[in-house]
Amino acid sequence: MDFFKKEILDWSIYLSLHYIAHACSNSSTSHIIQEYNLIRTYKKVDKTIVDFLSRWPNLFHILEYGENILHIYSMDDANTNIIIFFLDNVLNINKNGSFIHNLGLSSSINIKEYVYQLVNNDHLDNGIRLMLENGRRTRHFLSYILDTVNIYICILINHGFYIDAVDSYGCTLLHRCIYHYKKSESESYNELIKILLNNGSDVDKKDTHGNTPFILLCKHDIDNVELFEICLENANIDSVDFNGYTPLHYVSCRNKYDFVKSLISKGANVNTRNRFGTTPFYCGIIHGISLIKLYLESDTELEIDNEHIVRHLIIFDAVESLDYLLFRGVIDINYRTIYNETSIYDAVSYNAYNMLVYLLNRNGDFETITTSGCTCISKAVANNNKIIMEVLLSKQPSLKIMILSIIAITKHKQHNTNLLKMCIKYTACMTDYDTLIDVQSLQQYKWYILKCFDEIDIMKRCYIKNKTVFQLVFCTKDINTLMRYGRHPSFVKYTSLDVYGSRVRNIIASIRYRQRLISLLSKKLDVGDKWACFPNEIKYKILENFNDNELSTYLKIL
């Protein structure tokens, strides 16, 4: 595997460099200014070598003279032998075709022979040998091999390399294999992980983030049941990472039903809370009913924080899970926090559209006022969410809540002007001039409010038969009534209004759509049927009893 050939050489070089850096830092003191000393001069050095060494300015001072003549200086006399070993034996800097230069030409390198040479070399400097001792906390190159041919790992293990050596992040090779697991190469990774586990690699060893290999296996998208069961036999199933997540948290988040079942059957704590107060049950319920049933049917009693769990479901817009938990009597959506916030207010706050519609249909009371003076409507404006604003206004909020919402909106220096105008536009048709204009913070919108009232007054003064245009636009919900009046020229002319013209246009569009449905269905029924004998007026009267959805359905069927 070409990647392995490049990786083993690259990290053996880095290993040497990190040992040198460690030795230099130990031998120098901060209050002594040291000078660079010439170590060696090399000729015909490949530019790749120069670029590589330049990445380590704290170790090497490099001067180039002429073409490919390299003078290398260092501050550390005590470790000169180690540095020379690195330059001559590891980099092969004096020979044509150094290891670095040939990394891309993997066919010309006998990696197996190089590994044997490295581990069997009897003439290694003592400093170099220290890097290969078991258990030493260095940047051990074994712990950096991310993808490999497993025979080379076996060679290294058989020569006594410490299998759980860690890098500066506290990661072992087992950590690294799981971190960089690729589904496309899962067979190679699975084999290597099994080799490491069978050779006693510690599944509970934590890196600097508190991740054990077993936690990583649960956290990442690895669905290998065999690896999971091997780790499960030796792992601490309730170990936690830096954020307090356990393996059960992660497999629940990933919706891995079989892994959750195995951990629960092994006695994993289902009530462990992470630093955010979330239990594994909370992580699992957002995915659907199957995991909920598994937790509810377990022998352990679940700790349920009603407000927390409902808000968790709202954040993820998990309507199906909420509905099932309500059906089972596990939760209650009719709560009020100490700030007078309700479940509907939370749905608006987190922009959970589907959850909001569900809660409004189940419990329509959304006219709550929080202790800070916010309402659901003012929160929708603060979130710049026009869709949720339209849903709330369609539920016909009261004049009181609209005035309070407008006051709350205008308290903020930055607010969505268009959404505020939607509120004013809705409120203007419910109130009189004095009630609305007295809101001091609305003075900058006075011209818009006056425009709203002017258009409303015009519509109130215009009658079509026994109804005003205002009644038809704002008070009439029956579509058939609107069909009788909406085609009148006096109604159509109000489509040109600046503020409420769009509302009139929407009504006319709905009328035309319904007329088209009725006409198409009537024609379909005419073919080969006694229906054709009825007068058109009778046909229309009959079909008017169906709503638009029913008319559309019949058209599809016929």
From Swiss-Prot:
UniProt xrefs under InterPro entries: Ankyrin_rpt, Ankyrin_rpt-contain_sf, PRANC_domain
Highest taxon of source: Viruses
Short name of one Pfam family: PRANC
ANK repeat placement: 65-95, 169-205, 209-239, 243-272, 276-304, 339-368, 372-401
Keywords carried by this UniProt record: ANK repeat, Repeat
SUPFAM superfamilies to which the protein is assigned, alphabetical: Ankyrin repeat (SSF48403)
Entry function: Contributes to viral release without involving rearrangement of host actin.
Protein family membership: Belongs to the orthopoxvirus OPG189 protein family.
UniProt protein name: Ankyrin repeat protein OPG189
Organism of origin: Variola virus (isolate Human/India/Ind3/1967) (VARV)
Underlying gene: OPG189
